């Protein structure tokens, strides 16, 4: 699985998250008009109208935040009926309508699964339908079974159930560390493994910074001795996709010291000149 950035939809989602409440309804309607299909699919208009579980999960979160149950149910129905992998209880990460088999890649993307499960928990809290929380519990159970492992002294969530545990290392994506969701799962289940995952994720982030910016690369290798390095199969850089890292940290703890290098680096640029990526070698 080689994930491509979904910058158009991601950028709009980020703007929705930080839109003043008085404008949130209008922003949500604009977002739906641009990316939401009547069948419940979120399309990446900058990438051949493909869909990803991350986009579905984020949209489900936004539907809950906007008290839009009708849209939420369409999103969830399409996701569950089209992307669900019945063999492991997770979701195919990508849907490409141009292919004969739109879900040819049968791997999952753990961040998408996490976002979907988290949105379902929030849906139950808002609309008092235990069917949502039951579905969420099934997804989190599947994530623990297929994506969460203990490696080199850390509890980690692999980016996908296949292809990220190699002979002498595992590959991690720090932008998949959805801390507030992991905390919500811990509160829901009372399982310590979710708190361990969050704690170890923070420990790893403290050590992942490199280069002039002291920021982690998009993909990171963790070897059996606990050594961290940029993963070999990807460019050694931090791209726009990784802006999710400080977002999730801030959602979890707005005063976290882990935000310091992000503020220091991006604070030096005018908003219109924010770099799309940072090469750790420069």
Segments from the language model and where they lie:
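Active-site-adjacent structural elements in enzyme catalytic domains
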Residues: 74-78, 121-122, 134-142
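Extended ligand-binding clefts on enzyme/binding-domain cores
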Residues: 25-26, 49-53, 110-111, 133-281
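Residues in the short coil linking paired helices within alpha-helical repeat scaffolds
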Residues: 68, 129-132
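Aromatic-rich carbohydrate-recognition surfaces in CAZymes
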Residues: 52, 56, 103-125
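Bacterial N-terminal signal peptides that target proteins for export
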Residues: 1-9
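Low-complexity, Ser/Thr/Pro/Gly-enriched N-terminal "stalk/linker" regions
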Residues: 21-54, 64-98, 103, 152-153, ...
């Amino acid at each position: 699985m080689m994930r491509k950035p979904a910058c158009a939809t991601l950028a709009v989602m980020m703007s929705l998250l930080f839109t003043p409440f008085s404008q949130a309804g209008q922003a949500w309607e604009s977002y739906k008009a641009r990316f939401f299909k009547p069948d419940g699919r979120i399309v990446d208009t900058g990438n051949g109208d493909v869909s990803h579980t991350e986009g579905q999960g984020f949209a489900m979160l936004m539907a809950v935040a906007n008290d839009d149950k009708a849209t939420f149910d369409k999103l969830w129905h399409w996701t569950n009926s089209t992307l669900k992998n019945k063999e492991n209880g997770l979701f195919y990460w990508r849907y490409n309508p141009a292919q004969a088999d739109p879900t040819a890649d049968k791997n999952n993307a753990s961040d998408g699964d996490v976002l979907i499960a988290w949105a379902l928990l929030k849906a139950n809290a808002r609309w008092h339908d235990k069917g949502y929380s039951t579905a969420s519990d099934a997804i989190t159970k599947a994530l623990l079974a297929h994506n969460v492992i203990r490696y080199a002294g850390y509890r980690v969530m692999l980016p996908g159930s296949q292809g990220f545990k190699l002979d002498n290392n595992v590959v991690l994506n720090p932008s998949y560390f959805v801390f507030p969701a992991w905390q919500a799962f811990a509160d829901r289940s009372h399982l310590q493994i979710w708190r361990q995952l969050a704690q170890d994720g923070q420990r790893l982030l403290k050590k992942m910074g490199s280069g002039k910016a002291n920021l982690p690369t998009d993909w990171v290798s963790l070897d059996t001795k606990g050594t961290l390095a940029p993963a070999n199969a990807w460019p050694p850089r931090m791209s726009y996709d990784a802006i999710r890292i400080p977002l999730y940290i801030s959602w979890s703890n707005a005063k976290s010291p882990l935000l310091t290098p992000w503020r220091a680096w991006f604070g030096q640029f005018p908003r219109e000149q924010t770099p799309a990526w940072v090469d750790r070698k420069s």
